[in-house]
Swiss-Prot record:
GO molecular function: electron transfer activity; heme binding; metal ion binding
Record's miscellaneous remark: The second heme binding site has an unusual CXXXXCH motif.
Keywords: Electron transport, Heme, Iron, Metal-binding, Periplasm, Sulfate respiration, Transport
Post-translational modification: Binds 4 heme c groups per subunit.
UniProt: heme c 2 binding residues: H49, C61, C66, H67
Biological source species: Desulfomicrobium norvegicum (strain DSM 1741 / NCIMB 8310)
This protein's name: Cytochrome c3, 13 kDa
Known role: Participates in sulfate respiration coupled with phosphorylation by transferring electrons from the enzyme dehydrogenase to ferredoxin.
Pfam families: Cytochrom_CIII (PF02085)
Length: 118
């Protein structure tokens, strides 16, 4: 399958819940522009971990049985990989931090540096 171009944007899936701010409803973060070609040196299966098992088909991260929990992250589920938020944050931020530690070029790790578009 053809990879998306550099205009690809990662956004919260429909139905995603925002974390409340005290007794007020919260808001979802801004979307994340994803420059796919900058990640072309990474093996596809590093991010698309079911690629081989699915016969080369790229499925959405929120496919049933994968990262399909749309709850907001809190202390009780902070490590639950079923949460789509945790899946992206673990994959992206951990990789960027590892590259930074190895003094290699990398992407951002701060919220506002990734979540930049509406």
């Amino acid at each position: 399958a053809d990879a998306p171009g550099d205009d690809y944007v990662i956004s919260a899936p429909e139905g995603m819940k925002a974390k409340p701010k005290g007794d007020k409803p919260g808001a979802l973060q801004k979307t994340v522009p994803f420059p796919h070609t900058k990640h072309a040196t990474v093996e596809c299966v590093q991010c698309h971990h079911t690629l081989e098992a699915d016969g080369g088909a790229v499925k959405k991260c929120t496919t049933s049985g994968c990262h399909d929990s749309l709850e907001f992250r809190d202390k009780a589920n902070a490590k639950d990989i079923k949460l789509v938020e945790n899946a992206f944050h673990t994959q992206c931020i951990d990789c960027h931090k590892a590259l930074k530690k190895d003094k290699k070029p990398t992407g951002p790790t701060a919220c506002g540096k990734c979540h930049t578009t509406n």
